[in-house]
C-alpha cells in the first residue's frame, strides 16, 4: 500500500486551488456546455422539425429520449477504459465524434433516421459526464468536490439560459439560407464547435495532476494529500456490482435525471401551448428557469461543502421539486404561474443534481471509481429516455400535459425518498 505523502505546509492551498480552478474548470464547463446543448437542442428543434417532418408527439418524445439508450449501452465500456487511456484522449474522442453526429442531424428526413441519429449521438457521448466526475476526483478532495462539480455542471443551466435564445436566433435568421430549414442550421452551427473543442482537449488537458507541467512537485504532493491515497479505501469493480447502496444511488439518480430531462425537452412546447408564439420570445422565456438553476447550484454546492453534508442537501430539493410539479399541474393554461413553478422545479432539480454527484466519489474509491461512477450514471441516465418519452406518451393518451406533470411529481418524490433512505460512509469491500 502506497503511503500518503505529507502535505507541504509552506504552500498556500487557496492560491493553489485558485490556479487549478482557473486552468481546468472554465475549459471543462465549455465542453460540458456544448454536450448539454447537443443533447437538448432537439427540444427547440421540435418547434419547426416536427411540423416539417410530420412526427407525432409520441414519436418525438421517443426520439428525444433514445439518445440515452445509446449512452447507457456504451457508458460502462467508455469509463472502464478511461483510467487506462486517460482523460485527454477519452474526452477528445467523445467531443469530435459527437460534434460530427450532431451536425449530421440536419440530414434527418424520417422517424427511423431521427431515432438512429439520436442513438448514435448517445453512443458517441457515452462516458462524458461520469468521466468528468472521475477526472475531478483526481484533483479535488471531499472539502472542495461539490463546488468543483457545481462549477462544471453549471454548464447545464447556462446551456438552458443561452440555448433558447441562440437556437431561436439561428432558426429564425438562417431559415431558408442555402436551402436549409432553420432547425437544420441549428444542428449544424451548434455541432461544429465540439469538433474544435475535441482537438483542443488533446492539446490542453492534463490527464492527472502528475502530468501538469504548470504544477511544482510540492503542489502535486499537496493535491495528492488533499485527495487522499486511492488505496486507503480501495474497492474492486466486482464488489461495487454487489453493493446494494450503489443501486439505491443509481435509482435515485434515475428519478432526478428523468425529471430534469422531461423539463429540458418539453419546456419550449409547454410554454408554446400557453400561447407564446414568437420563437425569440419563447427562447428568452425558456432561459428564465436556468438562471434560477445556476444560482441554486452554486449556493447548494458551496453550502454542502461548508457543512460537510450531502444526503439532505440532495433529497430536500428533490422533494421540493415533487411538490412544485404537482402545483404546476394544478395551474392549468396560465402562462405566468406555469413559468414561475417550472422555474422553481428546474432550480430544485439542478440543486439536487449538483450535490448528488459529490456523493459517489466519497463512497467508491480506488481503481473501481471510474467504473462505479459509470454504473450509477448508466442506470440513472436511462431516466433521460423514460422522462421525455413518458411525457410524450401520457400527453398523447390523455390529451393534456397535466397527468404527465403529476407523473413527474411522483418520480421526483421517489428520488427524494431513496436519497433519504441511504446512509453512506467510505466503502471498504
Regions found by a protein language model. Give the residues of each.
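Extracytoplasmic gate region of multi-pass secondary transporters
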Residues: 42-43, 240-298, 353, 357, ...
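Conserved MFS/SLC helix-loop-helix module at the cytosolic interface between two early adjacent transmembrane helices
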Residues: 73-112
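Helix-to-loop junctions at the C-terminal end of transmembrane segments
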Residues: 74-86, 296-309, 395
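Cytoplasmic membrane-interface "Motif A"-like loop-to-helix N-cap segments
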Residues: 83-95, 305-318
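Cytoplasmic helix-loop-helix junction between adjacent transmembrane helices
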Residues: 117-154
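Glycine-rich segments within core transmembrane alpha-helices of 12-TM secondary carriers
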Residues: 147-171, 193-194, 377-387
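C-terminal transmembrane helical hairpin of 12-TM major facilitator-type secondary transporters
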Residues: 310-359
Amino acid at each position: 500500500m502506497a503511503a500518503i505523502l505529507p502535505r507541504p505546509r509552506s504552500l498556500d492551498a487557496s492560491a493553489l486551488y485558485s490556479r487549478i480552478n482557473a486552468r481546468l474548470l472554465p475549459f471543462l464547463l465549455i465542453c460540458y456546455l456544448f454536450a448539454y446543448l447537443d443533447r437538448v437542442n432537439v427540444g427547440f428543434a421540435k418547434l419547426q422539425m416536427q411540423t416539417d417532418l410530420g412526427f407525432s408527439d409520441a414519436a418525438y418524445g421517443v426520439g428525444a429520449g433514445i439518445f440515452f439508450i445509446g449512452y447507457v449501452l456504451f457508458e460502462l465500456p467508455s469509463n472502464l477504459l478511461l483510467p487506462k487511456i486517460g482523460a485527454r484522449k477519452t474526452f477528445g474522442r467523445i467531443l469530435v465524434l459527437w460534434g460530427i453526429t450532431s451536425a449530421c442531424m440536419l440530414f434527418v428526413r424520417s422517424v427511423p433516421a431521427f431515432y438512429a441519429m439520436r442513438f448514435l449521438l448517445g453512443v458517441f457521448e457515452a462516458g462524458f459526464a461520469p468521466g468528468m466526475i472521475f477526472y475531478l476526483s483526481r484533483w479535488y478532495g471531499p472539502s472542495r468536490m461539490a463546488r468543483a462539480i457545481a462549477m462544471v455542471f453549471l454548464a447545464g443551466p447556462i446551456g438552458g439560459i443561452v440555448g433558447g435564445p441562440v437556437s431561436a436566433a439561428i432558426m429564425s435568421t438562417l431559415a431558408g439560407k442555402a436551402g436549409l430549414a432553420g432547425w437544420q442550421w441549428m444542428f449544424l452551427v451548434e455541432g461544429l464547435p465540439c469538433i474544435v473543442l475535441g482537438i483542443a482537449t488533446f492539446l490542453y488537458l492534463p490527464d492527472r495532476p502528475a502530468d501538469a507541467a504548470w504544477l511544482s512537485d510540492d503542489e502535486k504532493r499537496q493535491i495528492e494529500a488533499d485527495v487522499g491515497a486511492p488505496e486507503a479505501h480501495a474497492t474492486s469493480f466486482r464488489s461495487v456490482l454487489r453493493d446494494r447502496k450503489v443501486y439505491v444511488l443509481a435509482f435515485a439518480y434515475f428519478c432526478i435525471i428523468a425529471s430534469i430531462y422531461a423539463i429540458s425537452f418539453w419546456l419550449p412546447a409547454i410554454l408554446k401551448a400557453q400561447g407564446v408564439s414568437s420563437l425569440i420570445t419563447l427562447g428568452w422565456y425558456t432561459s428564465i428557469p436556468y438562471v434560477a438553476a445556476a444560482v441554486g447550484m452554486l449556493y447548494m454546492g458551496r453550502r454542502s461543502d461548508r457543512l460537510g453534508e450531502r444526503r439532505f442537501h440532495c433529497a430536500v430539493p428533490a422533494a421540493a421539486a415533487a411538490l412544485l410539479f404537482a402545483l404546476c399541474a394544478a395551474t392549468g393554461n396560465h402562462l405566468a404561474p406555469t413559468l414561475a413553478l417550472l422555474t422553481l422545479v428546474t432550480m430544485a432539480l439542478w440543486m439536487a443534481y449538483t450535490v448528488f454527484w459529490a456523493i459517489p466519489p466519497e463512497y467508491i474509491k480506488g481503481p473501481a471509481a471510474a467504473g462505479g461512477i459509470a454504473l450509477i450514471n448508466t442506470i440513472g441516465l436511462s431516466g433521460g429516455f423514460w422522462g421525455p418519452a413518458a411525457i410524450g406518451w401520457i400527453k398523447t393518451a390523455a390529451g393534456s400535459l397535466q397527468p404527465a406533470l403529476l407523473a413527474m411529481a411522483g418520480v421526483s418524490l421517489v428520488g427524494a425518498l431513496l436519497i433519504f433512505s441511504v446512509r453512506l460512509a467510505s466503502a471498504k469491500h
